């Protein structure tokens, strides 16, 4: 008795480049579909509901168009404010005398500054602990 196996590979038969381009196109469409687009294409909302939503969110009905939805480069400002994370003194006390000069080095924090998208100013996090202080606590 012979058994025949049907090879169902699904997406594996489609070239990788096509899969990637298809994914990128659908991702870009989904990512740029904003609340404005939801309001424009939602037929179940009455005119009064639309007006109240526009007033509460500060959106204008004339700007809600899918052609005006922002693409990736327009989401972020071209020039970020000049933000310098604090310079912390990195002190290291080695157990052996082999690495004596390591303790005298000064190292900048490698953290990425968080920018408030509305004001485009550096966000200040309350209760944030620097990485050097966190290491000392452990």
Curated annotation (Swiss-Prot):
<dbReference type="GO" id="GO:0005634">
    <property type="term" value="C:nucleus"/>
</dbReference>
<dbReference type="Pfam" id="PF14618">
    <property type="entry name" value="DUF4452"/>
</dbReference>
<protein>
    <recommendedName>
        <fullName>Uncharacterized protein C22H10.02</fullName>
    </recommendedName>
</protein>
<keyword id="KW-0539">Nucleus</keyword>
<feature type="modified residue" description="Phosphoserine">
    <location>
        <position position="110"/>
    </location>
</feature>
<keyword id="KW-0963">Cytoplasm</keyword>
<dbReference type="InterPro" id="IPR027915">
    <property type="entry name" value="DUF4452"/>
</dbReference>
<dbReference type="GO" id="GO:0005829">
    <property type="term" value="C:cytosol"/>
</dbReference>
<keyword id="KW-0597">Phosphoprotein</keyword>
């Amino acid at each position: 008795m012979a058994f025949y196996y049907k090879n169902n590979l699904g997406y594996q038969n489609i070239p990788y480049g096509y899969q990637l381009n298809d994914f990128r196109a659908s991702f870009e469409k989904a990512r740029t579909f904003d609340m404005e687009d939801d309001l424009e294409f939602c037929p179940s909302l009455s005119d009064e509901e639309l007006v109240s939503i526009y007033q509460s969110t500060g959106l204008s009905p004339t700007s809600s168009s899918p052609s005006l939805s922002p693409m990736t480069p327009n989401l972020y400002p071209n020039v970020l404010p000049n933000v310098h994370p604090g310079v912390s003194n990195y002190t290291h006390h080695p157990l052996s005398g082999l690495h004596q000069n390591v303790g005298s080095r000064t190292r900048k924090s490698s953290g990425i500054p968080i920018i408030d998208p509305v004001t485009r100013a550096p966000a200040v996090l309350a209760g944030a602990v620097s990485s050097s202080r966190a290491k000392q606590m452990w």
